[in-house]
Amino acid sequence: MTMHDCFVFPAAPHLPAPDMPAVERWMLRERIILPAVGADVPAKALYALSHAISCLPGANVPLVDADWRTAADVVATHVQAGNLPDALRVNGDGSVEDCVKAIRDHGIALDDAWLFGKHAACTWFSPRYRAGPGMVRLYDPDRIGEIDHLSIVLFQIDAGEPPFVVFGAGTSAPTVPGEDTEREDFPPFGDYMDFIGAVYEDLHVDWVHPDSGRRYALLDLDWEYSLGIGRCFIQFEDGSGYDLERFVQALGEACGQRMTYAHRLF
């Protein structure tokens, strides 16, 4: 099964990063995302919580129910299945984080399988959020039906960790602005993969065009929105990216720097 995620991030990742908690507050204030409590927890977060509970010693097979609306629904299903004790009590209108705390406070060693994949490399990350009416105003009206399926998480990679790279099945050689054909060679690095590798080691690395003498950062090239790199991201799980252009523009205006996006097929 093909998975399709979209990532929004600074177009100049070597410059000072935006304040990601401030970006989160702006998105909540504008109701681009909704507080992740009660029935506004996205399905992806509910399924991740269920997966983590299913990994407990002695638990039954993984459980998934399309009728789940809250994190408490997930817990109730696992209590009924015998994966959690009958005495466990959680807030019916709480968050996934509230339920995890209640489970652990009950003496159950629930691991971090409910978190998103890159959490261990992060200095900060948000809960998974559902899109709100503010996102509806910024979304492609022809694709608005997809918005309920989005799960949105903000994260910042720790400075001591390698940068995060958005790279997938759709990534291929880029085009230099003003040129008509894809370019494979990027001397002195080698091919475009070698250039990506050099920037992965140092975000400040750029490339000098051998003919024009012009300098290009990695993301100055046209990757047809199939490559991203940096430390600050907003991930739209199950999002394509093409429908987010107005959001990207609004975000750039809000945080005072140009933003871009990339989509990943895997």
Where are these regions (language model features)?
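N-terminal alpha-helical interaction blocks
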Residues: M1-G170
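Generic detector of bulky aromatic hydrophobic side chains
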Residues: M3, E24, A71-V75, S95, ...
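Generic hydrophobic, helix-prone segments enriched in Leu/Val/Ile
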Residues: V23-R29, F195-G197, I234
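Compositionally biased, intrinsically disordered low-complexity regions
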Residues: D40, H119, G134-V136, G170-S172, ...
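Long, charge-rich boundary regions
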Residues: Y200-F266
